[in-house]
Amino acid sequence: MLEVSNLTAIRDERVLFENLQFEIKPGELVQIEGRNGTGKTTLLRIVTGLGDRDEGAIKWKGEAIEKSRDQFHQDLLFLGHQTGVKRELTAFENLRFYQSIHNSDSSSERIFHALTQVGLAGREDVPVAQLSAGQQRRVALARLWLSHQILWILDEPLTAIDKQGVKVLESLFSNHVDNGGIVILTTHQDMFTDSPKLRKIKLGD
């Protein structure tokens, strides 16, 4: 379980949010909503431990994330605005590298499957530097198919993804929460209309 209590973030003397409280349990899909500038990305970065908070506490499995940093990071997959892919490596090599550092199943078949799911079949051996920005984003998203982490925190994962790609990702998110995972994301696109699986947390009200 992820617990956020009395969370406050102030940037440039402007309060983005204060005394924010919520709990997210395994099997939940949560969308963070709000206008631009309300602190959605800031919230995700704070929850992952990458951003500073002014007040409040964040716990994972009952422990403050500062005290259980190693376990928390083992359980976390974060995809932010930066893709985090290595431009000098190919798409395939990037995912192989990801497998090696996360002790994932190292089968080549899983990598090919992941790249197919994000529409990069046939581009496996192309250096990432030669891919478009949207394709580089898809290489990063392909990690989701290789992930064993429980907690997925995703900042605008649907950017530059077509309708079919959105459906594929929605199915992946559903399967992840059905298997006891947690997905927290921001997006400007409509998702899971009226789905009981989707819970929304709105910032800026």
From Swiss-Prot:
Topology class, membrane: Peripheral membrane protein
GO cellular component: plasma membrane
InterPro entries (UniProt xref): AAA+_ATPase (IPR003593), ABC_transporter-like_ATP-bd (IPR003439), ABC_transporter-like_CS (IPR017871), ABC_transptr_haem_export_CcmA (IPR005895), P-loop_NTPase (IPR027417)
Residue positions binding ATP: G34, R35, N36, G37, T38, G39, K40, T41
Biological process according to GO: cytochrome complex assembly
Reactions this protein catalyses: heme b(in) + ATP + H2O = heme b(out) + ADP + phosphate + H(+)
UniProt keyword rRNA processing present: no
Record's subcellular location: Cell inner membrane
One MF term in the entry's GO annotations: ABC-type heme transporter activity
Main location: membrane
EC number: 7.6.2.5
Biological role stated in the UniProt entry: Part of the ABC transporter complex CcmAB involved in the biogenesis of c-type cytochromes; once thought to export heme, this seems not to be the case, but its exact role is uncertain. Responsible for energy coupling to the transport system.
Subunit composition and interactions: The complex is composed of two ATP-binding proteins (CcmA) and two transmembrane proteins (CcmB).
Similarity-based family: Belongs to the ABC transporter superfamily. CcmA exporter (TC 3.A.1.107) family.
Protein name: Cytochrome c biogenesis ATP-binding export protein CcmA
Native organism: Vibrio vulnificus (strain CMCP6)
Gene this protein is translated from: ccmA
